[in-house]
């Protein structure tokens, strides 16, 4: 039926469901049209902006009759900014969508038998993010900060972000004022990560292609002018400036972790703590003695498990993360842990050869999931149990379809609402050898 639709055609109808990614689904003569920022039950008019063989994408033109599932989004940039997809939906609808996204994806892509998925809901749905990364665009011989728009190209300049801070918190406005003073004669772009410290201050991490020496003084003056900044890290491929104290120390359970804004850390402190507690609880139940923690970052999970008396080996390719993991091990006086730097697919076989009795393997890969070679190595090693933590249901389903074909079964599956107001969700799966 694609011949019935052309670009800019307006279509009227009802949104019947949400697709993976959060867009509403409108069916037009059996043809699927995805309409972002709509809710099931909405009566709408939309305009076609993209046509593919099996579906089309449209933009909302008019909301004729709003769904009862709608709420008023508090963010002034919602619908333009590409960061949040679900602010217009009430909390229960968001949770239902995420549960459905996980179970449907595991069944459709993985062809898996999925036990009932438990959802760990977030108590904090706003101002929850530990850090944000803003894009810096050249603007009037200086810079402007913001998020990439829904067109995946334009910059939406912002002065607030309600999933990071309260709406009237001035921190982003202060940042915009500061970066507008930075000369940018080469008209380069960059990135800025803003990390909350536990002392109500912020750490800034700038990344540029090259550094303008004239700006070093301005960064130093910023710490004096804005006491809310505790430290600034400025990096390029060839240089790094460390101004003030760009290191964060955060307490998780009874341990102290030191890191910089460049390190990966889960963004929702409350929800990530539930995940760490779940992993610790499982390892006690399983009576695991030797544990491999793959993609271990700067060692939070590894060190929490080591504090329980488990022997843990963490593997991570990022050299800075491994350096902080080792520092955190010394900081917390934990001897039952070692950290190895390198690609998992290269280090893992060596590690398994030297540690022949690994009880449990924990994997927390990036969005792309596990490589085929890592899956092959794990299937050869056949640990009794695996814990797979994922923020991408599609790659989780792909990997589990291989692992669970003959060797493993899903023993437990828990979802964590780590990213309220967005379409993203974190999943923890406990796999047991058949």
From Swiss-Prot:
Belongs to the class I-like SAM-binding methyltransferase superfamily. RNA M5U methyltransferase family. Pfam families: tRNA_U5-meth_tr. SUPFAM superfamilies: Nucleic acid-binding proteins, S-adenosyl-L-methionine-dependent methyltransferases. Its EC number is 2.1.1.-. The active site is at 391 (nucleophile). This is Uncharacterized RNA methyltransferase pc0248. Residues 4-62 form the TRAM domain. The keyword Transmembrane does not apply.
């Amino acid at each position: 039926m694609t011949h019935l639709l052309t670009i800019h055609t307006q279509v009227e109808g009802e949104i019947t469901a949400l697709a993976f990614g959060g867009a509403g689904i409108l069916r037009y003569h059996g043809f699927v049209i995805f309409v972002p920022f709509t809710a099931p039950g909405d009566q709408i008019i939309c305009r076609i902006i993209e046509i593919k063989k099996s579906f089309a994408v449209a933009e909302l033109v008019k909301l004729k009759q709003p769904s009862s599932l709608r709420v008023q989004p508090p963010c002034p940039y919602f619908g333009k900014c590409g960061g949040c997809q679900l602010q217009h939906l009430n909390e229960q609808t968001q949770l239902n969508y995420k549960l459905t996204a996980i179970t449907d994806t595991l069944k459709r892509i993985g062809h898996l038998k999925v036990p009932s998925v438990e959802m760990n809901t977030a108590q904090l749905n706003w101002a929850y993010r530990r850090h944000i990364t803003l894009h810096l665009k050249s603007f009037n011989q200086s810079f402007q900060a913001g998020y990439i728009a829904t067109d995946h190209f334009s910059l939406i300049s912002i002065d607030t972000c309600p999933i990071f801070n309260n709406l009237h918190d001035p921190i982003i406005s202060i940042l915009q004022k500061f970066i507008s003073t930075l000369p940018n004669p080469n008209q380069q772009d960059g990135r800025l990560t803003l990390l909350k410290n536990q002392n109500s201050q912020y750490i800034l991490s700038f990344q540029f292609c090259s550094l303008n020496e004239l700006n070093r003084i301005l960064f130093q003056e910023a710490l004096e002018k804005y006491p809310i900044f505790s430290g600034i890290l400025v990096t390029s491929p060839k240089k790094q400036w460390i101004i003030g104290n760009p290191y964060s120390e955060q307490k998780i359970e009874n341990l102290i972790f030191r890191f910089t804004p460049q390190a990966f850390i889960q963004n929702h402190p409350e929800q990530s703590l539930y995940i760490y507690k779940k992993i610790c609880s499982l390892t006690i139940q399983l009576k695991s003695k030797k544990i491999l923690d793959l993609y271990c970052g700067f060692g939070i999970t590894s060190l929490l498990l080591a504090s329980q008396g488990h022997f843990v080996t963490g593997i991570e390719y990022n050299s800075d993360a491994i350096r902080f993991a080792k520092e955190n091990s010394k900081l917390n006086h934990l001897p039952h842990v070692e950290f190895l730097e390198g690609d998992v697919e290269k280090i893992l076989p060596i590690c398994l050869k030297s540690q022949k009795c690994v009880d449990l393997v924990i994997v927390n890969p990036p969005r792309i999931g596990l490589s085929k070679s890592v899956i092959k190595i794990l299937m050869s090693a056949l640990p009794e149990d695996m814990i797979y933590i994922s923020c991408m249901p599609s790659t989780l389903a792909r990997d589990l379809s291989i692992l669970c074909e003959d060797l493993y079964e899903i023993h437990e599956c828990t979802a964590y609402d780590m990213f309220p107001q967005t379409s993203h969700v974190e999943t923890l799966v406990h796999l047991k050898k058949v």
